[in-house]
Amino acid sequence: MHGKWCVDNERIILVPYYYDIIDDFLSESDMDNYYKTFTHGGFPWTLITKVNENAEENDFQFAHKYIDDRVEVYDGAIEALRPIFRELYFAKYMSKDTEVYRAKTNLFIKTDTSRGLGFHHDITNMGDNYKTIIYYVNNNNGGTRFEDDTFVESVRNRALLFSGKIAHETVTQTDTNFRFNININYNSSSTPLIKENLNES
């Protein structure tokens, strides 16, 4: 886990802005199934004309929603995410009382130059007491950047978990036509991602 130093009322403190990186997160069969599903011609995508509120007007993407505002978008949507939920539960990042706010797959197309698409928080109407997992489906030189300039590269079968307190941005890829990731925002009192007691290790 990683902390972040910041200035708060003229005091320099370590705030609980943590993120974890877990490689080889899913089994090869589950990983391969996601990739084949997303690259199948019949998989439905929705055009998002602006990636986030801080993106440029022409920064677009495609998305496939499973859960939106705590509601399953279609029958079977939660089942499609079961491999990820299962691993999060066994790794103690989720518990039985977990509430999923939003879950979707993102599709970004290749750009001529690598660039950030705007720092943002995924959920803006629920405070910052939530967690995010970004699951990277394929290898490419794009990824996720935090405000402290930490860059997490999009590596196949990698999971990035972090506090909703942390602003982050998508970084586009230049080496593959498509970049896929699964983004899930959730809350669970048992998850270790936010530690209010800084004495905990």
Annotate each language-model stretch with its function.
Residues H2-T98, S201:
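Non-heme Fe(II)/2-oxoglutarate
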